[in-house]
């Protein structure tokens, strides 16, 4: 049986400095629980088969949508983006601590491959 223990999420954020590079904390029901530090602009993308959940632990995350709408996600808030909706996460220059729940097959850049794409995620 797997060891059952609590995870200090803020402590996990202290273990890495890379931005836009998700790290895996655990898995459940075919999904990964990931943490990621975000800063400045990410790529426009969508996820054809998966909804995406953003949960902000520190800072303020901005999510732009193609209809010119921007949603602000503050500390302690979540935002769920339905599959197929094109979006671009960004910050106003601050480092934002974010938690994600996504199917194991989800690529963080969705339908776009760029220099920001990370295919082999590290466990922390």
Where are the language model's segments positioned?
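A short, N-terminal "cap"/entry segment at the start of jelly-roll beta-barrel domains
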Residues: 1-34, 115-124
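Short acidic/polar mixed-charge low-complexity motifs
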Residues: 31-32, 40, 61, 69, ...
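A cytosolic small-molecule/anion-sensing beta-strand core signal
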Residues: 29, 57-58, 74-75
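Short, conserved beta-strand element in jelly-roll/cupin
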Residues: 37-38, 47-66
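Short acidic-glycine-tyrosine-enriched beta hairpin
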Residues: 67-83
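Conserved short histidine dyad/triad with adjacent acidic residue
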Residues: 18-19, 32-48
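Ligand-binding loop in jelly-roll beta-barrel domains
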Residues: 83-112
